UniProtKB/Swiss-Prot annotation:
TM ranges: none
InterPro entries: AdoMetDC_C, AdoMetDC_fam_prok, AdoMetDC_N, S-AdoMet_deCO2ase_core, S-AdoMet_deCOase_pro-enz
Site residues, Cleavage (non-hydrolytic): E62, S63
Gene that this polypeptide is encoded by: speH
Cofactor note: Binds 1 pyruvoyl group covalently per subunit.
Native source species: Thermodesulfovibrio yellowstonii (strain ATCC 51303 / DSM 11347 / YP87)
Protein known as: S-adenosylmethionine decarboxylase proenzyme
Described purpose of this protein according to its UniProt entry: Catalyzes the decarboxylation of S-adenosylmethionine to S-adenosylmethioninamine (dcAdoMet), the propylamine donor required for the synthesis of the polyamines spermine and spermidine from the diamine putrescine.
Keywords: Autocatalytic cleavage, Decarboxylase, Lyase, Polyamine biosynthesis, Pyruvate, S-adenosyl-L-methionine, Schiff base, Spermidine biosynthesis, Zymogen
Modified residues (Pyruvic acid (Ser)): S63
Entry GO terms, CC: cytosol
């Protein structure tokens, strides 16, 4: 089945807590992951909580990468959602796992936007004039 996007739900257990609590490190890891996956970065926004924990998003032309960290548990929840054929979400995921020194990662892959009942390949972006119902 063809889908509009691929969504990787990544659980990172037993990570290096020093990395998970460092705002610049977390931000750089997600930005670098987007670049390594061949994504086009649109904007970056991260927030550091008191006493610890970071949430952030890297908005890409092809969708987004998000993270929420719990350094006190050595845990992070990461989403890598991508659309189109030029971006490689699995490359981003592998880089993130390695960069956080994660010892127990797990990844669930979901295909998003399975809207064609004819199992036909769908274009990633279409012009407004080209929009049509595909089912």
């Amino acid at each position: 089945m063809y889908a509009l996007g691929t969504h990787l739900l990544i659980e990172l257990k037993n990570c290096n807590p020093e990395i998970l609590k460092d705002l610049e490190s977390v931000k750089n890891i997600l930005v670098d992951a987007a670049k390594k996956a061949n994504a086009t970065i649109i904007s970056v926004n991260f927030h550091e909580f008191n006493p610890f924990g970071i949430s952030g998003v890297v908005v890409i032309a092809e969708s987004h990468l998000t993270i929420h960290t719990w350094p006190e548990y050595g845990f992070a929840a990461v989403d890598v959602f991508t659309c189109g054929e030029t971006i490689k979400p699995e490359i981003a995921a592998q880089y993130i796992i390695e960069a956080f020194e994660c010892k127990v990662p797990s990844i669930v892959e979901m295909k998003r936007g399975i809207i064609s009942h004819r199992n036909e390949k769908l274009p990633h972006k279409v012009c407004h004039e080209e929009l049509q119902v595909v089912y």
